[in-house]
């Protein structure tokens, strides 16, 4: 995946996450963890992952379902798009 595609995925994930949890996209850092830093409950995180289906992202893929922080999710989604 080229750098532009990675940036597009990162922007998509961060924008959707910001909209979902009600924060400004600039407040979301790559290293933020979903449960601790972004204060998402496991149910909220699960719902967020399920909502990624509208972007044709498979939320049940192991790398996506097991992501603990924003950058892990971005990398997992990026690798899924390449496959």
What does each of the following model-derived ranges do?
Residues 2-49, 54-83:
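Phosphopantetheine-dependent thiolation modules in NRPS/PKS and related acyl-activating systems
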């Amino acid at each position: 995946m080229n750098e532009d595609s990675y940036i597009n995925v990162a922007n998509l994930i961060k924008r959707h996450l910001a909209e979902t949890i009600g924060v400004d996209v600039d407040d979301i850092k790559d290293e933020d963890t979903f449960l601790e830093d972004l204060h998402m409950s496991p149910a909220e995180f699960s719902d967020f992952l399920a909502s990624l289906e509208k972007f044709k992202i498979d939320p049940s893929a192991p790398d996506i379902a097991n992501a603990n922080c924003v950058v892990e999710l971005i990398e997992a989604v990026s690798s899924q798009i390449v496959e």
